[in-house]
Swiss-Prot record:
Transmembrane segments: none
UniProt keyword Signal present: yes
Function: Parathyroid hormone elevates calcium level by dissolving the salts in bone and preventing their renal excretion. Acts by binding to its receptor, PTH1R, activating G protein-coupled receptor signaling. Stimulates [1-14C]-2-deoxy-D-glucose (2DG) transport and glycogen synthesis in osteoblastic cells.
Keyword field: Cleavage on pair of basic residues, Hormone, Secreted, Signal
Name by which UniProt lists this protein: Parathyroid hormone
Keyword match Glycoprotein: no
Any one Gene Ontology cellular component term annotated for this protein: extracellular space
Residue ranges of the region described as Important for receptor binding: 51-69
Compartment(s): Secreted
Main location as per UniProt: secreted
InterPro entries hit by this protein: PTH, PTH/PTH-rel
Tissue localization of expression: Highly expressed in the parathyroid gland. Also expressed in the placenta, thymus and testis.
Free-text disruption phenotype from the record: Mice are dysmorphic but viable. They display diminished cartilage matrix mineralization and reduced metaphyseal osteoblasts and trabecular bone during the fetal and neonatal period. Fetuses show a hypoparathyroid phenotype, characterized by hypocalcemia, hypomagnesemia, hyperphosphatemia, low amniotic fluid mineral content and reduced skeletal mineral content. Mice lacking both Casr and Pth survive to adulthood with no obvious difference in size or appearance relative to control; they however show a wider range of values for serum calcium and renal excretion of calcium.
Length: 115
């Protein structure tokens, strides 16, 4: 067995080591500025990629809509009527054609043009 003197010395040494290091459960070293900048850049990159994927999906939806043969309105504000009713069908298969809008739809379109 160890004597009480030896146990006391070991306890004092361990107490000194614990008090002098003062880690308190924190990381031993702080992150360097370059690591923080790297994490910031990674976050910005991921957000940018997410926005690009969202935009790509929206553009793909628009491309699919246009590729069905639906004629778009001219930029000068005049509207073109499609030649055939089959060309005027919505993408999701809704039988209501684009030319046959509800009164609420027409009101929304008129309000959006005035802005």
């Amino acid at each position: 067995m160890m004597s009480a003197n030896t146990v006391a010395k070991v306890m004092i040494i361990m107490l000194a080591v614990c008090l002098l290091t003062q880690t308190d459960g924190k990381p031993v070293r702080k992150r360097a500025v370059s690591e923080i900048q790297l994490m910031h850049n990674l976050g910005k990159h991921l957000a940018s990629m997410e926005r690009m994927q969202w935009l790509r999906r929206k553009l793909q939806d628009m491309h699919n809509f246009v590729s069905l043969g639906v004629q778009m309105a001219a930029r000068d504000g005049s509207h073109q009527k499609p030649t055939k009713k089959e060309e005027n069908v919505l993408v999701d298969g809704n039988p209501k054609s684009l030319g046959e809008g509800d009164k609420a739809d027409v009101d929304v379109l008129v309000k959006s043009k005035s802005q």
